[in-house]
A protein has these predicted regions:
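Cysteine-centric redox/oxidoreductase cores and disulfide-bonded domains
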Residues: 99-206, 211-215, 220-224, 229-234
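Intrinsically disordered, low-complexity regions enriched in Pro/Ser/Thr
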Residues: 8-9, 171
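Hydrophobic alpha-helical transmembrane segments of integral membrane proteins
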Residues: 13-14, 204
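Extracytoplasmic thiol/disulfide redox context detector
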Residues: 2-8, 14-105, 192-195, 235
């Protein structure tokens, strides 16, 4: 019930963007011959995890796709994090979508419909153009008849106005897959529950928020803040 209420609230805010069988035990040490960026899984709550399941460092990021600080951290940290740590099996990354508004919900829903191999790359690409698609999406409310649409219709209109249909099409998502993803009630409920857990159960103070091996890391704003924490956890 809670997730349904949260979902309804998020969809109602579409035009109010936020202010800024067990496998064999894997070896703990990195395997040079394997690129762990191609390994992905999901937690019981549906969060996507990229990397070696037995990585010594388990990194969790709570993020919002409409958070400018998240976009900044992504631009600085994701390339070296993937290349130097996740690919080598040293670190795994779990992404928890702490959705804040309707734009965020539509973007996060579509990202989670991507094949895991494209997931982090698509997050990077969306963050890189965040100001542009947020501005375009705001125009959806000016279209006559918008207010009379259902919540799902509003979300689809905003997603298209934001250019998400063409963005994901360029990355291999067919129009049919796009429409199916946007209409997937189970995926909507799971995402709404993840957002509710982030803000209510986990009581995060804001985004981005980083956990390293289950411990909150305060004051992580860029790669210069994050990398020393990862290195320390690897010792």
């Amino acid at each position: 019930v809670k997730s349904r209420l949260l979902l309804a609230a998020l969809l109602a805010a579409l035009c109010v963007p936020a202010l800024a069988a067990p496998a064999a035990k894997p070896k703990a040490k990195a395997t040079a011959a394997r690129n762990w960026l191609t390994t992905a899984g999901r937690t019981a709550e549906g969060a996507i995890v990229i990397g070696n399941p037995a990585a010594k460092v388990k990194l969790v990021e709570y993020l919002s796709m409409t958070c400018s600080h998240c976009a900044q951290l992504s631009a600085e940290a994701l390339p070296p994090l993937q290349r130097d740590y996740i690919a080598r099996g040293l670190v795994s990354l779990e992404v928890r979508h702490a959705v804040r508004d309707g734009y965020d919900f539509a973007a996060s829903l579509l990202l989670r419909c991507e094949p895991p191999a494209r997931y982090l790359e698509s997050i990077e690409a969306l963050f890189a153009t965040q100001p542009q698609w947020m501005q375009k999406g705001a125009g959806a409310a000016a279209v006559p008849g918008f207010d009379s649409k259902s919540s799902d219709e509003k979300m689809l209109a905003v997603a298209r106005a934001s250019g998400f249909d063409s963005f994901f099409a360029r990355r291999g998502m067919s129009p049919q897959a796009f429409a199916a993803c946007m209409a997937d009630e189970k995926a909507q409920q799971q995402l709404a529950q993840m957002a509710g857990n982030s803000w209510e159960r986990d009581a995060i103070p804001g985004t981005p928020l980083i956990l390293i091996n289950g411990k909150r890391q305060e004051g992580v704003h860029d790669w210069a803040d994050l990398e020393p924490l990862i290195r320390a956890a690897l010792k």
